[in-house]
């Protein structure tokens, strides 16, 4: 069996978060995330919404929670049993199920009410201390960090496996 892809998020300050992606759990979501990474979509993008004890949300090129890649992806069409525990990566979306694009979140703490509702697709393997540090920054009333928490680069190691472009709505 092939090794799962590993994502490396290098923050502007040099801190690193590594996460394993789960294509067997959320194939289209993983395909989309890898495609965006390969197009340098996340480089220079901030975590625009940070809620200590809940999650860090990023992936919006506009930096305000309204932006995306210009398309939306289809859901995975099957049950996703990955629980929203600390360190899990999941796709942000509107209230419409097939509305995810590029925004994702990293769980700071467990949030079982999200299980089965959002497409969880990976988990932090290194750098939970970095997630904790970002989760503790001072934010404004809209949960936006007062100091930008910028992803300098986001890269992925696919171990030679080719992942297709995502299915879009």
Q: What do these predicted ranges mean?
A:
Residues 1-169:
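Cyclophilin-like peptidyl-prolyl cis-trans isomerases
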């Amino acid at each position: 069996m092939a090794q799962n892809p590993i994502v490396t998020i290098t923050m502007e300050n040099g801190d690193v978060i590594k996460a394993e992606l789960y294509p067997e759990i959320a194939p289209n979501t993983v395909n989309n995330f890898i495609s965006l990474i390969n197009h340098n979509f996340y480089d220079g993008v901030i975590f625009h919404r940070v809620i200590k004890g809940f999650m860090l949300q990023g992936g919006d090129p506009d930096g305000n929670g309204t932006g995306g890649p210009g398309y939306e992806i289809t859901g995975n069409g099957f049950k996703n049993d990955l629980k929203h525990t600390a360190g899990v990566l999941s796709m942000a979306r509107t209230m419409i199920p097939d509305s995810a694009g590029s925004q994702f979140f990293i769980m700071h703490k467990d949030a079982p009410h999200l299980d089965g509702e959002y497409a969880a697709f990976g988990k932090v393997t290194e750098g939970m201390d970095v997630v904790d540090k970002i989760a503790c920054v001072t934010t404004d009333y809209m949960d936006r960090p007062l100091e930008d928490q910028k992803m300098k680069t986001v890269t992925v190691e696919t171990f030679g496996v080719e992942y297709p472009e995502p299915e879009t709505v």
